[in-house]
Amino acid sequence: MKERKPKYGWYVKKLIVGFSIVGLLGLSLTIFGFYFEDWMELLLIISGITLMILFLWPGLGMGIMNINLSNKSLSRKETKLSYVIKSPKILDVGCGTGRHAIQIAKTLKNGGHLYGIDIYSKVAIGGNALDTVQRNAHLEGVDNKTTFQYGSAIDIPFDNEMFDIVYFSSVLHELHMEGGPDKALDEAYRILKPGGYLKIAEWNRSSWQTIVYCGIFCLVFKKYQYWSNLIKKHGFRIEKQRKINGMHRFSAIKPKI
């Protein structure tokens, strides 16, 4: 019997396919341009190169990004709090298919429980679904210390001061409704215990990795200072911040009263 393996899917798979198709059309226009003369040649070549820069670049780049991410595990530094806090309650907001949530759950050696919520959009992640993440947790042997359910980042379905750690990994920039990130951080503050930790990772629009992966679409991401100011605005104290692998990473604390 064939061994079943977890399926984590690709981030923005549909975008990658769409961009790549349009980009390949641009490549075709560029090649055909050399078979014409004068203004038609120039028009086809310029149009083709433009389409390749705008679409083929990020299409291929985000494909490479997914391959790189599939081969990476969270470092001990990124999951340190799971070891330090005794029996922590952890929430991963926007858990998707569980790529990071399940890695965190594997670090829970001394009790504790990881919860994950998502709206399970297949636009964000290919194959994204509640039954997918639950199946992945079972196959990875952590279904006894994980709970996954539907839930929105701007209306988190848990009680006040319930969690020791809350994660937002590449989620806040996806909240396109007015005041979305503000509402999400208000919710994070509400559900965190005093002294609890907020962990945020967001793509850094200025990093060479993000530019290589996303091309001109790197501009959809915010600058470092935006996230820093937003975190402080909502009452958190930033403990650590760093830029690594194309991302801003923040570790902040909800002050004890």
Predicted ranges, named:
Residues 182-194:
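A short glycine-rich, Lys/Arg-flanked "PGG" loop and its adjoining helix->strand segment in the class I
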Residues 85, 154-166:
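A short acidic, Gly/Pro-enriched loop at the edge of an enzyme's catalytic core
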Residues 133, 219-235:
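Short alpha-helix
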Residues 195-202:
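Conserved beta-strand signature within the Rossmann-like core of class I S-adenosyl-L-methionine
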Residues 8, 13-15, 42, 52-82:
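Class I SAM-dependent methyltransferase Rossmann-like catalytic core
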Residues 234-257:
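Core SAM-dependent methyltransferase catalytic element
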Residues 108-109, 175-176, 192-194:
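Helix-to-beta-strand junctions that scaffold the AdoMet/dcAdoMet cofactor pocket
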Residues 91, 99-154:
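Class I SAM-dependent methyltransferase SAM/SAH-binding core
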